[in-house]
Amino acid sequence: FPRFDAGLEKFDGTPLYEVQDPAMAVHPMWGTMLYNYVSPMVKDFLISNAFFWLDEFHVDGFRMDDVDAMLYLDFGREAGQWTANLYSSNENLQAMEFLKHLNSIVKKQYPGILLIAQEDGLWPQLTDSVENDHLGFDYKWSGGWTKDLLSYLEAEPLDRRNYYDQLTLSMMYAYSEHYVLTLGKRDVGTLKEFLEKLPGSSRQKDAQLRAAYGYLMLHPGVKMTAPDGDVGPEMRAYLHDLNELYRNHPALYAMDGNSDGFEWIQFTSYDENVVAFLRKAEKP
């Protein structure tokens, strides 16, 4: 949580909400305070906040940012700047238990709520169940997929053969978690800003934009798009048609979590810059 005079830092003059150890209380990358997940009061406070949004505002779900900063004691810290847990490892055991408790109690009261983790530290099985002693998120935000696709798109066409693997890398791990794929404003900026990053003429930029959203919708994983108000009528119609295509073809979603629902046709076409694959639905 942020540090300012009217905030939670030393709320009553003592470290009430933050980690008790001064050396571990402030995150060195962002200068923010870290919650004390050992304290029952702090855990109740955080869970009450979640239920306030659920009860009063009827939100559809939560995306939890930087979950790796919660889970790893040494996240963003150099040697000597962090204290190991009782097993002499770098996992934040209290944060793990808090997330399990939060996710399980939210799901018990609101079974349809989506719980999404944004985590880049390769924590295993984020989206496996609490019953299996994992964290119980529904989905993991696939920032790696977005980053790889953008690095390919922003390259000059003649140089894209050197970035071709960025298009196919995601299928190496696509079934290790349940992923959310996104090309929203948070990832690419406004559509105008997105287009400015792409090479070529205005017509070529528009074609690449359509290809990017098409690849998003056809790739395994749950989709999230949030184009801004700059969307013109042609692009709006294209996105509408993509959504209709997705809804009307179960092969694009029915086996998202099963590798049997995907088959590569072409994934070594470096010079032509073509990828081809089959998406499959379960047999009737």
Predicted stretch roles:
Residues 152, 238-241, 245:
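Residues that form generic nucleotide/phosphate-binding pockets
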Residues 45-48, 52, 211, 237, ...:
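A non-catalytic, amphipathic alpha-helix used as a structural packing/dimerization or gating element
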Residues 58-60, 75-227, 233, 247-283:
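Conserved alpha/beta catalytic core and glycan-binding cleft of carbohydrate-active enzymes
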